[in-house]
């Protein structure tokens, strides 16, 4: 899956994703390039949607993901590995992690669903206030949206769509018969 976060604090969002190329990517859609230090080779494919939060209260987001084979990874915003990671989860991971202070002790826990059951990693550092994408599709409603609207004031012809058009849609959502 794809998640969205302003990893480099430039005011625009980057796209974070993993896949069958064994890499975790952080792509800047404005520049059309990966951020410096990214992608990172995890040496195995991943089915998780990366999640982001300030795990160590330094003001920067950390990126959390896992390999399908059961290794959890955490990277700082600049692509450097978090201390003591990767860490084995003891089972295959085919879902996205979730981040939150589930025990109310002031630090984050990261929950992974594995083939061996739920695994919880307790991050024993004061948690920061920044949480961008802390679970699958970004929120409990699974909207996959930050609630933002793309607005353009560019008047150059052809850049902004002037009409909505659907062609050769199958199955047709407007005429299901």
What do these predicted ranges mean?
Residues 154-177:
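Glycine-centered coil/turn sites that cap beta-strands in beta-rich domains
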């Amino acid at each position: 899956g794809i998640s969205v976060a302003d990893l480099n604090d430039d005011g625009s969002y980057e796209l974070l994703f993993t896949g069958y190329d064994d890499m975790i990517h952080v792509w800047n859609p404005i520049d059309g390039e990966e951020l410096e230090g990214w992608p990172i080779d995890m040496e195995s494919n991943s089915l998780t949607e990366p999640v982001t939060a300030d795990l160590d209260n330094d003001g920067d987001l950390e990126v959390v993901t896992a390999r399908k084979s059961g290794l959890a990874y955490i990277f700082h915003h600049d692509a450097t590995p978090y201390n003591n990671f990767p860490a084995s989860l003891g089972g295959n991971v085919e879902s996205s992690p979730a981040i939150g202070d589930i025990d109310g002790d002031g630090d984050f826990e990261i929950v992974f669903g594995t083939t061996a059951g739920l695994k919880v990693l307790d991050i024993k550092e004061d948690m920061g206030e920044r949480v961008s994408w802390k679970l699958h599709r970004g929120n409990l409603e699974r909207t996959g949206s930050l609630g933002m609207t793309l607005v353009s004031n560019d008047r150059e012809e052809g850049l902004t769509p002037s009409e909505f058009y659907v062609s050769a849609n199958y199955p047709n959502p407007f005429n299901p018969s």
